[in-house]
């Protein structure tokens, strides 16, 4: 196991095909990365006290931190962190014990707290705060601290969610092809 991929107790990261994890990032414990995931520079993903699951073609951009919530008498089930497919997580985002659907864009510098649920086809503007246990309904732009539903997404914006994820897969493949990064 490399310095990038680290066990926690008897929990080891599980990595799909064509995954890129930048050498400056760290993935610890029960973390499950599906095919074509891109983990960019300076990302921390800790699946130590619960699991982290990241769906296919999702990208986690530079400086983001992903963690989970442990099981306790206060929260008997804890909160894993689950991220769907074709998701773009912008630079310096913090995700903690939340659930993100498919085709979501989480804007740069946003914070999503324990128990938050983001349905499919959602755009979260940069610098937003999604409070604990808040649900963001499918098909809308959300913005603010705390987030507010701003307006429905246009068809072009919805198509842009998938475009963003596909574009990052292309860039990830270019990095892998030129040898700047290696697959773990």
Curated annotation (Swiss-Prot):
Question: Which Pfam families does the entry mention?
Answer: Hexapep
Q: What residue ranges are annotated as transmembrane? A: none
Query: Which family does the record assign?
Result: Belongs to the gamma-class carbonic anhydrase family.
> Could you name the Gene Ontology cellular component terms for this entry?
cytosol; protein-containing complex
Q: Which organism is it from?
A: Escherichia coli (strain K12)
Q: Which CDD domains match?
A: LbH_gamma_CA_like
Judging by the UniProt lineage, the source's domain of life is: Bacteria
Please give the PANTHER family that the UniProt record associates with this protein: DYNACTIN SUBUNIT P25, PROTEIN YRDA
Protein name, please? Protein YrdA
Question: What are the GO MF terms of this UniProt record?
Answer: identical protein binding; zinc ion binding
**Which segments of the protein form a coiled coil according to its record?**
none
């Amino acid at each position: 196991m490399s310095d990038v991929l680290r066990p926690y107790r008897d929990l080891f990261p599980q990595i799909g095909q064509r995954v890129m994890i930048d050498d400056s990032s760290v993935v610890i414990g029960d973390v499950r990365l599906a095919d074509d995931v891109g983990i960019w520079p300076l990302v921390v993903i800790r699946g130590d006290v619960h699991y982290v699951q990241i769906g296919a073609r999702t990208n986690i951009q530079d400086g983001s931190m992903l963690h989970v919530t442990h099981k306790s008498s206060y929260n008997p089930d804890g909160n894993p962190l689950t991220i769907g497919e074709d998701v773009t997580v912008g630079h310096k985002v913090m995700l903690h014990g939340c659930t993100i659907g498919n085709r979501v864009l989480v804007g740069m510098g946003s914070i999503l707290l324990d128990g938050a649920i983001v349905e499919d086809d959602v755009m979260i503007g940069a610098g937003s705060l999604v409070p604990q246990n808040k649900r963001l309904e499918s098909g809308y732009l959300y913005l603010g601290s705390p987030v507010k539903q701003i307006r429905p997404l246009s068809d072009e914006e919805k198509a842009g969610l998938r475009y963003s994820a596909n574009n990052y897969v292309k860039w990830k493949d270019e990095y892998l092809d030129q040898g700047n990064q290696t697959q773990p």
